[in-house]
Structure formats: C-alpha cells, structure tokens
Amino acid sequence: MKKIAIIGSGMMAKPVADYLLEVCNYEIIGVDQEVSKARNVIGDRSLGKAISLMIKDSYDLDPIVGEVDIVISMLPRPLHIHVAKSCLRHGKSMLTTSYQLPEVVALADEAKKKGILFLDEMGEDPGLDHMGTQMLLDEIRGEGGKAVDIKSYGCGLPAFEHNNNPMGYKFSWAPTGFFAAAKTGAAYYLKGKRIEVSGDQLFKHFRLVDIDGIGTFETYPNRDCKKYLELFGLTKDISFYRGLLRYPGYCNNMRYLGEIGLFDSKQMENFENVTYRQFTASLVGADAYKNDRKPEEKVAEFLNLDINADFIHRLKWLGFFEDRPIDIKKGTRLDVLLDRMLKKMSYEPHEKDMIIVHVEIIAEFPDKSGEKRLATMMMEGIPYSDSAMSRAVGLPVAIGTRMVLEGKINAVGAHIPPSLPGLYKPLLEELATHGFVFTKKTIPF
C-alpha cells in the first residue's frame, strides 16, 4: 500500500486527503504544527494518521519523508524548500499547488540524478489555468493555427447570492498568502512588448472584463508571464496576459488600503489602549481627538477622496473608525487589517464560494480566418462542506500524486504543468468526474 505525507493542514488540505484516502485507498500521514488541524483533515479514517511537527529546517522532516512514498507540501510557499531538501536526501518526489520557488528549481539537476520529481503549480490558479491554456493551444495547433493573443483568468469569490458584504470578497484561502500575492508585482506581454507592474501599482492597473456567460469583473495582472512563453512554445510577438478576477470596486479598495499603510507587515507595534479610531487617524498623520475633524474626513483628505466615497464607507464597515480598543494587543498594521477582515469577511457555514478559470485565445489560421477560442470552468462550493476553492486546489494535486505513483508521470527534475504537456488530458478527464469541466466555445471573426 502506498503511503503519502501531506505536510500542512490549511484550508486547502482536506479535499487532498479525502481523494487519496477514499478514492485511492492510500495510507496518509497528515502533518501540521497543530495536531488538531491535521486531525481535522484526516478525520477518524483508519488509513490516516495525524502528527504534530514544528518545522524549523529540512532535517525536522526527515523521519516522516523517509517513511512515505511521496510528499505533498501544502505549506506556505517559502517553506517548500525545506520539504524539497528532505525529499532529495530520501529520494522522494514532491508536489505542491504553489508557484514554483526559485530555490526548488535550483535543485532540479540533483532531483534528476535522484530520479525524483518536484511538480509545482498543481492547484487552481496556478494549475487549472495552465491546463485550460494548453488544451486550447493544442486544439488550435492541431488545426494548423497560431495563437496571437492569450488571456487567462482565475478567481475564488463569493458565489453571486452570497456576495453580501461591501468589500466583494471573502476568505476561502489563507489570508497571509492572499496579502503576499497582493503585494507581488506582475508582468504581461502586449504584441511582444513586456509590460511590468510593480507591487505598489498593481491595483491601479485594472480594467473591466466580460466573462462569457457569467458576468463582468475587474481584472488585474497576476505574476510574471515570462517563463510561460517558452513553456507554451509561444512566439515573441504574442500578447499574453494572466489576470485575477474580482467583483467591481475591489481594486480601488485594495489600492486605498495599501496607500494608508495597512499592508505594512514589517514593523511590530503595541496596540494596548489604542482605539481603532486613534489607529486609523495615526495612519494618515493625524490625531483622532485634537480637533473637530473626524478621522473619516482626515482619511478622505489624505486619499483625495470625497467624504462619501465608497472606500470611506467600506473602511467604516470594517470597523476602523470605531471608538473602542483594538482587538489585538500587539502586531503589525497588516495584522490589524487581517483581524478585522477575518471577522467581517469569512464564510458562514451555509454560504458558497465559487471559482472561475477562464481562458481566451485569439488564433489565426492558414486560410487567413480568425477565431476566438474560449474555455471556461465555473464551480460553486458545497454548503456546510468543502469550498469550491479547496476542491479546485486540492483535487488536481491529489490526482497528480496518484498519476506519479502509478507511473503515468515519468518526468524527473523540477516541473510545472506547461512543461509536461501530456499531463492535462488525463487529469482533466478525471477532474470532470468530480464536476470540474471546461466548457468550450468558438467565436469566428
């Protein structure tokens, strides 16, 4: 019987364990710093075992990695390197759902010598977006066509009927990772020209996009497209954009939160006996009580907004103008924001999230005709059960793990889905049995 370690028991881990335990009948070791979290993922299933482990370096993982056949790391992205180093020592492959870490890529040659695979970007976005892109590219090329413009979008949002807060967002994945992504710069290509967007300009660089059959959203660029150009075999004159989708209003909300300093995660502060009102006034260099002007007015002036601007009302809804002590006593400004958001922007048990993965490719064909090819996946979460995001992230990496164990993926070294073009077809076929299907459409022009 195959044995798998799932390292990390965050919001995405349960569907991974469910698939490997119930569909594959594999033995699972769930590992987390807090054993209660690992138990929540494993449950009382006889093939599962929960273990508590504090991971300070790669050697802490050796007893577990040495015991299993393969490892799935669901840890925060920077920690994958510890897992990879332990896997190298023991000759075990590792899969993750995160963007590929340069430190792990640097181990590719050693992994090849050991005959093992480091397979990253096996989640929803990144992951399913790559597979949808590869699927359309293969179809276009199979008909003699050439892609000239690619747009790929992904998101996890409240389902339409549960988009019931003024921020237009709720947390279905770890908020620390959410804000790390919110500060990461991006780059895309417009007819071969590289457009770079720094992290502090990300939310100014948005536009509206209509997703066929679903609705209108804001999109802003998602990470750097550069490495995907070669992996997808794209020409230098391509237009290629990867973006995230959000409900309208989101980007300005995030922009202004950043501009008043709430994304600061570096400086620790003492919030003992500090009210939200005082804290918010201090963000814009004011005193909450020294004159007649309210903090709301001071924030609006700082941002050059009207006092009735949507953002001021949303900041008020989050509680930042309340005259009561801050709930956390010590932390960073970002910690204060996270605390308020998690209390106001979490899903109720009956509420549903939704994921959307949408790819649009404009193609030219030898007869001079042109087409826009669309592939769209949309799925809602299950009330009182798994979120759509947890399943869209967890199922691809779980299915990929089974494929590696069964010898259906024979690659070694460091890879992501675009560098393994034979991966997506069988994976998407099985994913369809779980309800995750790309709907395709062709628009001639």
Task: Identify the residue ranges that each predicted region occupies.
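Conserved Rossmann-fold cofactor-binding substructure of NAD(P)-dependent oxidoreductases
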Residues: 55-67
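Conserved N-terminal Rossmann-fold NAD(P)-binding element of oxidoreductases
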Residues: 4-8
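ADP-ribose/adenylate-binding Rossmann-like module
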Residues: 86-104
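Rossmann-fold NAD(P)-binding glycine/threonine-rich loop
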Residues: 98-120
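Rossmann-fold cofactor-recognition segment
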Residues: 45-58
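N-terminal Rossmann-fold NAD(P) dinucleotide-binding loop
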Residues: 13-14
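C-terminal catalytic/substrate-binding lobe primarily of soluble NAD(P)-dependent oxidoreductases
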Residues: 139-445
